[in-house]
């Protein structure tokens, strides 16, 4: 049986920008995408720690090393600049192929504190 399991998580990232007049998406620093294994255009679940909002969007890249986490379009109405968010990507796995998720624990400046 195939099951939907957590593939990757960027924990406690800080929202650096929001742009309502945009097509939609979450922009994530390319370095963080590479470290987490989250792909461009991948569907992600976002949880805002400050206000409890949870929503689904897709990923676009932000410049490598910029430390940008930007929410765009309708999703930008659900967060504020400075909010702490959890970004989660999931995959469909068989019991035998699933190992464990890649988890990035973030500092407040969106540098990586720890990788699990």
UniProtKB/Swiss-Prot annotation:
Keyword Cell cycle among record annotations: no
What GO terms in the biological process aspect are recorded for it?
alanine biosynthetic process; pantothenate biosynthetic process
Chain positions recorded as substrate binding sites: 57, 73-75
* Reaction it catalyzes: L-aspartate + H(+) = beta-alanine + CO2
Supply the InterPro entries for this chain.
Answer: Asp_de-COase-like_dom_sf (IPR009010), Asp_decarbox (IPR003190)
Q: Where in the cell is it found?
A: Cytoplasm
- Main site of residence? cytoplasm
Cofactor(s) the protein requires to work: pyruvate
What residues sit in the active site? 25 (schiff-base intermediate with substrate), 58 (proton donor)
Q: How is it modified after translation?
A: Is synthesized initially as an inactive proenzyme, which is activated by self-cleavage at a specific serine bond to produce a beta-subunit with a hydroxyl group at its C-terminus and an alpha-subunit with a pyruvoyl group at its N-terminus.
Paste the cofactor note: Binds 1 pyruvoyl group covalently per subunit.
- What are the GO MF terms of this UniProt record? aspartate 1-decarboxylase activity
- NCBIfam families hit by this protein: panD (TIGR00223)
User: What is this protein's record name?
Assistant: Aspartate 1-decarboxylase
Native organism: Fervidobacterium nodosum (strain ATCC 35602 / DSM 5306 / Rt17-B1)
